């Protein structure tokens, strides 16, 4: 899980979702998991 100020999809399978007012990226590749912090 990477915590960064701006989250962007890295590959075509990355999906941007909102959980508990947090913007997150979920993907099949675990390296692409991101969260806005």
Swiss-Prot record:
The keyword Cell membrane does not apply. GO terms for biological process: translation. The keyword Hydrolase does not apply. It holds the Pfam family Ribosomal_L36. HAMAP family: Ribosomal_bL36 (MF_00251). Belongs to the bacterial ribosomal protein bL36 family. This is Large ribosomal subunit protein bL36. It comes from Hydrogenobaculum sp. (strain Y04AAS1). The gene is rpmJ.
